[in-house]
Amino acid sequence: MYLLTINYSLQCKHYTKSNKKLYIAKIMTEFYRAPEIFRQNAIIVKKSRRDISDDENSTIVRRNCKIEASKLNSSLLRKVSGDLNDVIVTKKLKTDCWKLSEDTRDVTSMSLDRDTILLSTSQTSDNLQLFQLRNNEINEQARGGKLLHSLQTITVPGKSILATDIMQSQNNDTVVSFDDKVHDRILLSGHSDGYVNLIATSIENGNAKILRRFNHSKHLKVITDSMDSVDLATQIYNTSRSKPIRHLKTWNKHHFTSVINDSLFVYDVNQQCKDPLYLNSFPGLEHVDVNPVNPFTFSLTGTKFGQSGIALLDLRLGDGNGIRVPGPQDSNAESGKCYTSKWLDEYTVVNSVGKALKIWDIRYGKVRAHLLGHNGHVNSLDYDNEMKKIYSTDDQGLIMSWDIKDLKFTDQVMCCRPSHGIQSFGLPADCVQNGNIIQSPDLERIGNKKHLGSHFVGLADSHFISLQDQELRSYSVVDMPMVLPPPRNPLRLLESVSTETKSEPPATMVYSSSDETTKDSSNSAFEDSEDTLEYEAHSPMTPALDSMFDGKTHSFDIPTIPLLSGIRRGSDATFVCEGL
């Protein structure tokens, strides 16, 4: 677990008193810190003095330590060392920031694949832009530092692009129409008129080309919401009705999933007939995520899936009844507002319900943990399988990470809260503090409604990427050596004094109260916690673009493809297959 907390610096002053040099470390904080965070004694020291008649100057100190076993495993405690040269290597959070140019404005989507970033804009030209993150080889001392390279821009004709995705490089060879001698990347772009383009390009040479186009709208038909109304299924599709691609994701090598309104599509890009392999409509559908082990199991989230806000879909059941909603359902209860979900493993999935997160075990259909810490509605989730961390973002711009590596699920529902901040005070004893704030919300941005909704996040090669108002940020966890100042121990000071003044009689020890010892230990544990992380941002935040690859602009024409008329269906599961 790592924390994003305050920075501090040490300033040392010394003075001479009775030919004895003493050093005092004064801690200067940049931000406000609540005093005496740890109010309970981790170690209780009892001092006793026994008078010896033979030597009145002798002092004997007996210490009895009562250690509570439950506090020894706390991540907020560290081992106190008396070594002046004590150094530990701790994990800290490093942030790289870039201010994108004015050409990258009105961003509509962001997709990631390892170190490649694809942005789409609402402009008519240069509406696809490719970037790449690379290690900073020039400045080796910049631990975890990254450089942002602008690769190329692509102009895709047609309506505005609303969704994008990058196919993984290892799956390129599974696409029949892909030529690896010319191209090395496959992109997907979803437009506001229901079209999805399969695009091939080269990172170095460009030569972007549309391989295939998929028209979703021709497989839909119009029906009215009222059961008493006349069925309009046989009428021509209503072109004025909105049909944007709201979700687009590659699936199972050479397949992809997409969502229009409430309808879920599954396509095979190698199939000669451009009809979907699967089409069904789910009222209130917002997001789809694929099981990482079983690719035929989907998690569906939406605003009309009951209190749980999530449902499971098994594509292997061909009768259309593969949908299952976990948990008890109350027909009179209001449906949860769920906008996203993410699989953690084969049997565990997390979804958002309003301002809270729920971790489900699909084998039992029960909630195992609640993650509470957001003040706004959670609209994005990502999971780092290597570090076992969940990243969540709400509509106010708050980004949090949840460490679930040490969570042990039981029959009782666990409650997880932030480990720092106002919400970390006054929590019950059974509450797990594993949430960390990555980025706090910008109050000025929240007040400006014009910028709301322009926040995109994603996970790429263990780097958490955030895009907000043309500011791109990369968060990474790096190993950072940290010097630990030794505690102010009276025995250590007494030993140094007795070394310099051997001829003088031994000084009588001055006892400090148990409260003072507890205060020093608690402050040291808070300020130099082993898991404390430092927030670093480049200032001023200017783009660090490498001139190795100049921005390339590639325009191309759409191949002549006949547009087929069809009928639209808004809430049923069938589709019309028309021959090409």
UniProtKB/Swiss-Prot annotation:
One of its GO terms (biological process) is cell division. Residues 497-534 are annotated as: Disordered. It comes from the Eukaryota. Keywords: Cell cycle, Cell division, Cell wall biogenesis/degradation, Repeat, WD repeat. Signal peptide: none annotated. WD repeats lie at residues 102-141, 170-209, 222-261, 333-370, 373-412. InterPro entries: Quinoprotein_ADH-like_sf (IPR011047), WD40/YVTN_repeat-like_dom_sf (IPR015943), WD40_rpt (IPR001680). Residues 510-526 have a biased composition (Polar residues). Involved in cell wall metabolism and required for the separation of the mother and daughter cells. Belongs to the WD repeat DSE1 family. This is Protein DSE1. The gene is DSE1.
